[in-house]
Amino acid sequence: MKVRVGTTNPVKVRATERAFLRTFPDREITVEAVSVDPGVPPQPVGMEEVHQGAKNRAREAWNRGSYSVGLEAGLIRVGDVYVDLHVAVVRDPKGRETVGTSPGFQLPPDVTEEALSGEEVGEVFSELVGVREIGKRSGAIGVLSNGKVLREDLCELAILMALIGLETSR
């Protein structure tokens, strides 16, 4: 089974492979990373923007006969605060799309403030903790949770939630 993921970020590529292996344990899975333009700002804010980025990534990566995955992280307002979460769009070989999300978590207020002014959460956090390209490693969640939850876990969960939609739409 061929799966194309609309990113070259190794965390998202590994999460895609993990989710598909869990969903299709008897199939051989080949994941191909595809560089695409998500068509949204580098730091999406609001569910509409985050979903649009994931959908654009899935559509740009898709080829008939294969699955594709689009993953986008962003800030979503919940009451008076923002949470960081991932949205996944999975497109099946026939072009049907389903959506899933990861759990969300609250960022420190200063990080949220900088992100809302246009800075990427990953870049702000990289500077804060002195780890280059943290979004391609444990992510902000890895630091905040002391390694209990990693960005790869959040990405995998979002994809698994989207794959449930494909199972129930058959």
From Swiss-Prot:
Keywords noted in UniProt: Hydrolase, Magnesium, Manganese, Metal-binding, Nucleotide metabolism, Nucleotide-binding
E.C. number: 3.6.1.73
Signal peptide stretch: none
Catalysed reactions listed for this entry: XTP + H2O = XDP + phosphate + H(+); ITP + H2O = IDP + phosphate + H(+)
GO MF annotations, alphabetized: ITPase activity; metal ion binding; nucleotide binding; ribonucleoside triphosphate phosphatase activity
GO BP terms, alphabetized: nucleotide metabolic process; thiamine metabolic process
Binding positions (substrate): T7, T8, N9, P10, V11, K12
Keyword DNA-binding: no
A Pfam match: NTPase_I-T
Cofactor(s) needed by this chain: Mg(2+); Mn(2+)
Cofactor note: Binds 1 divalent metal cation per subunit; can use either Mg(2+) or Mn(2+).
Binding residues for Mg(2+): D37
Coiled coil: none
Keyword NAD: no
Entry-linked Gene3D superfamilies: 3.90.950.10
Subunit relationships: Homodimer.
UniProt similarity note: Belongs to the YjjX NTPase family.
Purpose of the protein: Phosphatase that hydrolyzes non-canonical purine nucleotides such as XTP and ITP to their respective diphosphate derivatives. Probably excludes non-canonical purines from DNA/RNA precursor pool, thus preventing their incorporation into DNA/RNA and avoiding chromosomal lesions.
Alphabetical list of NCBIfam families matching this protein: inosine/xanthosine triphosphatase
The protein's name: Probable inosine/xanthosine triphosphatase
Higher taxonomy: Archaea, Methanobacteriati, Methanobacteriota, Methanomada group, Methanopyri
